[in-house]
Amino acid sequence: MSSRTTLGLSAPDLSGLDGSGLKVAVVAAQWHGTVMTGLLDGALRGLVDSGVHDPAVIRVPGSFELPVACASLADHFDALVALGVIIRGGTPHFDYVCDAATRGITDVAVRTKTPIGFGILTCDDEAQALDRAGLEGSHEDKGYEAAQAAIATLTALSTALASGPS
Protein backbone atom coordinates (compact mmCIF):
# COMPACT_ATOMS: atom_id res chain seq x y z
CA MET A 1 0.00 0.00 0.00
CA SER A 2 1.14 3.51 -0.69
CA SER A 3 1.86 5.79 2.23
CA ARG A 4 -1.37 7.69 1.42
CA THR A 5 -3.47 4.53 1.73
CA THR A 6 -4.61 4.45 5.33
CA LEU A 7 -7.29 2.05 6.40
CA GLY A 8 -10.01 3.25 8.74
CA LEU A 9 -10.08 2.19 12.36
CA SER A 10 -10.95 -1.53 12.56
CA ALA A 11 -11.08 -1.87 8.75
CA PRO A 12 -10.19 -5.36 7.53
CA ASP A 13 -6.85 -5.83 5.82
CA LEU A 14 -7.85 -6.99 2.35
CA SER A 15 -4.38 -6.87 0.81
CA GLY A 16 -3.36 -9.80 -1.37
CA LEU A 17 -6.59 -9.93 -3.38
CA ASP A 18 -6.39 -11.29 -6.93
CA GLY A 19 -8.65 -9.30 -9.21
CA SER A 20 -6.73 -10.09 -12.38
CA GLY A 21 -9.06 -10.68 -15.30
CA LEU A 22 -11.98 -8.89 -13.64
CA LYS A 23 -13.96 -6.19 -15.40
CA VAL A 24 -14.65 -3.40 -12.90
CA ALA A 25 -16.19 0.05 -13.22
CA VAL A 26 -15.87 2.96 -10.83
CA VAL A 27 -18.94 5.19 -10.84
CA ALA A 28 -18.03 8.55 -9.32
CA ALA A 29 -20.09 11.64 -8.54
CA GLN A 30 -18.71 15.09 -9.30
CA TRP A 31 -19.90 17.22 -6.36
CA HIS A 32 -17.10 18.25 -3.95
CA GLY A 33 -14.31 17.96 -6.53
CA THR A 34 -11.29 17.92 -4.22
CA VAL A 35 -12.71 15.12 -2.08
CA MET A 36 -13.85 13.21 -5.17
CA THR A 37 -10.37 13.43 -6.69
CA GLY A 38 -8.97 11.72 -3.59
CA LEU A 39 -11.71 9.08 -3.50
CA LEU A 40 -11.32 8.28 -7.20
CA ASP A 41 -7.53 8.11 -7.00
CA GLY A 42 -7.81 5.84 -3.96
CA ALA A 43 -10.31 3.53 -5.66
CA LEU A 44 -8.11 3.22 -8.74
CA ARG A 45 -5.08 2.46 -6.51
CA GLY A 46 -7.13 -0.15 -4.66
CA LEU A 47 -8.09 -1.84 -7.92
CA VAL A 48 -4.55 -1.77 -9.31
CA ASP A 49 -3.23 -3.16 -6.01
CA SER A 50 -5.78 -5.98 -6.44
CA GLY A 51 -4.59 -6.78 -9.96
CA VAL A 52 -7.47 -5.13 -11.85
CA HIS A 53 -6.25 -3.64 -15.11
CA ASP A 54 -7.95 -0.76 -16.92
CA PRO A 55 -11.04 -0.20 -14.77
CA ALA A 56 -13.70 1.91 -16.44
CA VAL A 57 -14.48 5.28 -14.86
CA ILE A 58 -17.95 6.73 -15.28
CA ARG A 59 -18.74 10.20 -13.91
CA VAL A 60 -22.25 11.26 -12.88
CA PRO A 61 -23.35 14.62 -11.47
CA GLY A 62 -24.02 13.63 -7.85
CA SER A 63 -24.60 10.83 -5.38
CA PHE A 64 -28.32 10.73 -6.16
CA GLU A 65 -27.45 9.60 -9.70
CA LEU A 66 -25.16 6.76 -8.60
CA PRO A 67 -27.87 4.06 -8.26
CA VAL A 68 -29.25 4.46 -11.78
CA ALA A 69 -25.75 4.47 -13.24
CA CYS A 70 -24.82 1.34 -11.27
CA ALA A 71 -28.07 -0.35 -12.35
CA SER A 72 -27.29 0.39 -15.99
CA LEU A 73 -23.74 -0.97 -15.70
CA ALA A 74 -24.20 -3.98 -13.40
CA ASP A 75 -24.84 -6.51 -16.16
CA HIS A 76 -21.69 -5.42 -18.01
CA PHE A 77 -19.13 -5.60 -15.20
CA ASP A 78 -18.03 -8.16 -12.61
CA ALA A 79 -18.04 -5.54 -9.84
CA LEU A 80 -18.65 -1.84 -9.36
CA VAL A 81 -17.37 0.84 -7.00
CA ALA A 82 -19.73 3.73 -6.17
CA LEU A 83 -18.10 6.95 -4.97
CA GLY A 84 -19.75 10.12 -3.76
CA VAL A 85 -19.77 12.82 -1.11
CA ILE A 86 -22.83 14.10 0.71
CA ILE A 87 -22.22 16.89 3.22
CA ARG A 88 -24.88 17.90 5.73
CA GLY A 89 -26.39 21.33 5.21
CA GLY A 90 -29.15 23.23 6.92
CA THR A 91 -32.06 21.43 5.23
CA PRO A 92 -33.39 17.84 5.14
CA HIS A 93 -31.86 17.43 1.66
CA PHE A 94 -28.86 15.62 3.20
CA ASP A 95 -31.10 12.93 4.71
CA TYR A 96 -33.06 12.43 1.49
CA VAL A 97 -29.98 12.08 -0.70
CA CYS A 98 -28.18 9.81 1.80
CA ASP A 99 -31.22 7.55 2.05
CA ALA A 100 -31.84 7.45 -1.71
CA ALA A 101 -28.20 6.73 -2.56
CA THR A 102 -27.79 4.05 0.11
CA ARG A 103 -31.08 2.30 -0.63
CA GLY A 104 -30.51 2.59 -4.37
CA ILE A 105 -27.01 1.09 -4.29
CA THR A 106 -28.18 -1.68 -1.96
CA ASP A 107 -31.13 -2.47 -4.23
CA VAL A 108 -28.94 -2.65 -7.33
CA ALA A 109 -26.38 -4.91 -5.64
CA VAL A 110 -29.00 -7.32 -4.31
CA ARG A 111 -31.17 -7.33 -7.44
CA THR A 112 -28.29 -7.84 -9.89
CA LYS A 113 -26.07 -9.89 -7.56
CA THR A 114 -23.21 -7.57 -8.51
CA PRO A 115 -20.80 -6.58 -5.72
CA ILE A 116 -20.70 -2.80 -5.31
CA GLY A 117 -18.04 -1.22 -3.14
CA PHE A 118 -19.78 1.53 -1.17
CA GLY A 119 -17.59 4.62 -1.17
CA ILE A 120 -20.18 7.30 -0.48
CA LEU A 121 -19.07 9.62 2.30
CA THR A 122 -21.86 11.05 4.44
CA CYS A 123 -20.26 13.76 6.52
CA ASP A 124 -21.28 16.62 8.77
CA ASP A 125 -18.77 18.98 7.16
CA GLU A 126 -16.08 19.23 4.51
CA ALA A 127 -13.29 18.63 7.05
CA GLN A 128 -14.68 15.16 7.82
CA ALA A 129 -14.87 14.39 4.09
CA LEU A 130 -11.30 15.56 3.46
CA ASP A 131 -10.11 13.42 6.38
CA ARG A 132 -11.54 10.31 4.67
CA ALA A 133 -10.65 11.15 1.06
CA GLY A 134 -7.20 9.56 0.84
CA LEU A 135 -5.53 12.88 0.14
CA GLU A 136 -2.15 13.88 1.52
CA GLY A 137 -2.80 14.40 5.24
CA SER A 138 -6.05 12.40 5.28
CA HIS A 139 -6.43 9.83 8.03
CA GLU A 140 -8.41 7.39 5.89
CA ASP A 141 -8.75 6.35 2.25
CA LYS A 142 -12.38 5.34 1.76
CA GLY A 143 -12.03 5.12 -2.02
CA TYR A 144 -9.30 2.51 -1.62
CA GLU A 145 -11.37 0.62 0.96
CA ALA A 146 -14.47 0.60 -1.27
CA ALA A 147 -12.52 -0.78 -4.23
CA GLN A 148 -10.94 -3.50 -2.12
CA ALA A 149 -14.35 -4.38 -0.61
CA ALA A 150 -15.86 -4.89 -4.07
CA ILE A 151 -13.05 -7.25 -5.13
CA ALA A 152 -13.06 -9.09 -1.78
CA THR A 153 -16.83 -9.64 -1.97
CA LEU A 154 -16.65 -10.89 -5.55
CA THR A 155 -13.78 -13.22 -4.63
CA ALA A 156 -15.63 -14.59 -1.58
CA LEU A 157 -18.81 -15.20 -3.57
CA SER A 158 -16.94 -16.81 -6.47
CA THR A 159 -15.12 -19.14 -4.07
CA ALA A 160 -18.32 -20.08 -2.24
CA LEU A 161 -20.27 -20.70 -5.43
CA ALA A 162 -17.44 -22.71 -7.01
CA SER A 163 -17.29 -25.06 -4.02
CA GLY A 164 -21.01 -25.77 -4.29
CA PRO A 165 -23.31 -26.90 -1.49
CA SER A 166 -21.72 -28.97 1.24
From Swiss-Prot:
Annotated metabolic or biological route of this protein: Cofactor biosynthesis; riboflavin biosynthesis; riboflavin from 2-hydroxy-3-oxobutyl phosphate and 5-amino-6-(D-ribitylamino)uracil: step 1/2
InterPro entries named among the record's database cross-references: LS, LS/RS, LS/RS_sf
Catalysed reactions, semicolon-separated: (2S)-2-hydroxy-3-oxobutyl phosphate + 5-amino-6-(D-ribitylamino)uracil = 6,7-dimethyl-8-(1-D-ribityl)lumazine + phosphate + 2 H2O + H(+)
EC number, UniProt record: 2.5.1.78
Keyword Transferase: yes
SUPFAM superfamilies: Lumazine synthase
Annotated active site: 93
Gene Ontology molecular-function annotations: 6,7-dimethyl-8-ribityllumazine synthase activity
Coiled-coil zones: none
Recorded family membership: Belongs to the DMRL synthase family.
Name of this protein: 6,7-dimethyl-8-ribityllumazine synthase
Organism whose genome encodes this protein: Cutibacterium acnes (strain DSM 16379 / KPA171202) (Propionibacterium acnes)
